[in-house]
Amino acid sequence: MISAALLWCLSAAAYAGNAVENPDSLALVNAEWNWKSIGKGGEAGSAKVKMFGSDQTISAVKYPAARFKTKILHCPGDESSTTDMLASRHGYTVGVNGSYFNMRTLEPCTFFAMNKSVISLTPKSEGFRTNGLLAFKKKNGREMEVLYCDSTKFDQYRKNYNMVIASGPVLIKDGDTGTFAQDKYFTEKRHPRTVVGQDAKGNYWFIVIDGRFPGVADGATIPETAAIARYFGLKDAINFDGGGSSTLWTEATGVINYPCDNKKYDHVGCRRVPNVIVAK
């Protein structure tokens, strides 16, 4: 039987096209991912890849949306904790950090609504990077949408979706790469990045690109992050909070990536966050 990981490699290789034209995509496909089952057809893997003229450490989880329940956990203020702790504490088997937040109050600072109630709104200062939404119509999270965010429609989003959170930028929408704000620090400088998205085969993907460890994990610009999502075969993808927040965890593997909040290249430098995307 061909494993799901091998099927991904074959499809990604086909998507990548000519090796001479696209060496970065083939470097991603040909890396040693060491995929591990997380149950119910889901897999987790991590690899060190030389691409974009840099050294990358990339971790990914993919799972069939129809066999998992996906949710956004809201744990602000004193309820906040690290991504791995929040996911495990609430009985989930997969977790990735969520959207932008106030690091002093540990409250979300982007539009966020659950169960028809608005939790927070996006201030104008966040508009340049928070141009998207991750939305789920059903409580079980089995219908994901990545949308461009219109701040005049927050009440409409609240009514139409069971869970919806603003983040960004949108990396890929319906197979098309997004247009990114020109910003030397956020967009054009390499940082740790977190990506949530879906492919055309019914799989949800959580991806973390580690950074701030030169020569091992250089991090990615926003255009490079979009390219990585595309190389994985995602048709829809959105960028979430990065930097020291970027954390990817599964019950089967523990923290997969190398969170940088402790400035050490290990698996324990996780930052407290107020919301996470989880699945079980």
Question: Where in this protein do the model-derived segments appear?
Answer:
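Short, solvent-exposed aromatic-acidic interface loops
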Residues: C75-S80, C149-Q156, I209-P214
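Conserved beta-alpha junction segments in alpha/beta enzyme cores
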Residues: K50, N162, P169-K201
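Conserved, well-ordered active-site substructure
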Residues: T105-F128, A181-Q198, F206-D236, S245-K280
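Bacterial Sec-dependent N-terminal signal peptides
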Residues: M1-A19
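Structural recognition of the beta-strand scaffold that forms the well-ordered cores
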Residues: T93-N97, A135, G197, W205-I207, ...
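Zymogen propeptides
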Residues: Y15-K139, E143-E145
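Short acidic-glycine loop/turn motifs at beta-strand connectors
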Residues: P64-A66, A135-E143, K173-G175, Q198-N203, ...
